[in-house]
Amino acid sequence: MADPSTPNATLGALAATYLAPWRTAGVSQKQVDAAHLHWADYRDAQWGGAVPLGTSRNRLLRVNILGGRLYYVSCVGQRSTARKVRQRAILALIRATLAVHELPDVDLVLSLSDRPTVPRHAVMDGSPPLVFGYVTTAWHWSVPFPYATFEPQRWAPLYRQLGHHPALEVRKPQAVWRGSCNSLCDMLKGMRSGGSGGASGGASGADQSGGCSIDLLDRLRLLRHAARCPELTDVGLTKEHVHCRGFPARAPLTLREHAQFAYLIHVDGNGFSGRLEELLSLGGVVLKEESPFGSWYYPLLRAHEHVVPLARNLSTLCDSLRALREEPRRAATLAAAAQRFATAYLAPERVIGYVAALVRGYATLQRFRPRRHPMAKEWAGAETMVSRPTAATTTDATLHSASSGRASGFPFSMALHTGGSNSGHFCPPADVSCCKRHPRACRRRRGTR
C-alpha cells in the first residue's frame, strides 16, 4: 500500500480500508448513541480492567462537526489530568483540520484509551459500533485516529527538526530507552494473566514481578535483556516501580538527548505506546518490539526497511544491536529509510489530510442527519493555547524545553509525553487538584526545582 510518491492517495486509501467494515450497513444514530455511553471501558480480562457488557463507568468523547464548527461532549472528569490533555489534543487536531479542509457534518465518538475497547467477540449481531481510537488490534473493532502526539502545535516543531539531528556515525553506538514501568499489570492490580490476547511469545507465566505475569511486563523484559549487553544499551526507568524491582531510577532524557544515540528502542506500556512517531523523527535506527497494538500509520511501516523488529519477548535485543554495530552501512540505510517514512507520511499536513479523509469517509456511512448533541459545547481552541510559536522560537532550545515538559510558548498538551522520556506531569495554571497530586510539576511551572 505504501507509495512514497503519492502519500495523500496512500493515506486516503488507508482511511477507506479502516472504514470498510461499515460500508454496506452504514452507521445509525442509535449506534452512535450506544457507542458513546457503553463502549468506553475495557472488556478484555487478559488485559485488565474487564467491564461486563451492558455496563460502563465512562463515556467516549462525542464530537459534532456542524457547518464547519466544532462541538464536543467531554469524556473527562475534574481529576482526569492525562485524559484532559488527550482530549484537548484531539480537539486541536480536528480544529486544525477544519482550518484547512471543508468537512461535512458528522456526529462521531472517539476513545482516548491506549487500548481498544470493542472486542470482536463481544459484538455478535453483525453491527459493531464504530469507535474511533488511538489503537487497534486484530481482535477489536476500532478505526485508528492519530494519537495526541500529533496535536499540531506539539508535532510541528518536532517534525521541523527532521534532518537537523546529529549524523548517525557521530552518535553514541548504543540503544537508548527511558520511561516508566507502565504495563498491563497495572490494570490487573496484581492478578495473573488469564488469556493469550496480548501475551504471545513471552516467558513463563510463573516468572513474575509484583505478583503479575511476566507476559504483560514488556518493560521489565526490556530492562532484563538490556542488562545482558550493557555495553550496547543505555536503558533505564525514570521512576522506581513495584513491577520492576531491582532497577533504580535514572535521569530522564529529552528528545534532543535521545537523538545523541544511534539506536532507539520502542516497546509497549499499558497497551499501545505513542512514542514511535517521535523516534522516527530523530534520524536514528528504530528497534520496535513486535506488538498486538497498531496505530493509524503502522500498516505502512515495513520491518527491516523502516524499523528493526524485535521479538515480542525482546530476546533478540542484544543480537540485533550487535548486528547493527557490525553492519554500519545497513544501519545508515535503516535510519535514512525511517526519516524518509516520517517525511512522506507523518508531516503535519499529511496527518491533517488523513483526518480529513477519515471524517469524509465516515460522513458517507452516516444513515442519519447529524445534529448537535444536547450536552455539546463549542470548542474554539482558546482553552488549549498559551501562545503560538513563531519561526524564531522554534529552535533546538524550544524542542528541548517542550520535550522536558516545561512551559515554552506551546499548549499544555506539549507535556503529554515529556519528550518520550516520561519525565513527569505538567499542570495547567490554577489546577489546584493537579498541583496537589503532582507538586513537582507545579514547581517546574514556577521555575523552581
Regions found by a protein language model. Give the residues of each.
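Secretory-pathway glycan-assembly enzymes, especially type II membrane glycosyltransferases
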Residues: 1-247, 252-253, 409-412, 424-428, ...
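General helical structural elements
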Residues: 223, 392, 441-449
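Catalytic binding pocket for nucleotide-activated donors in carbohydrate/polymer assembly enzymes
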Residues: 252-385, 389-391, 405, 409-439, ...
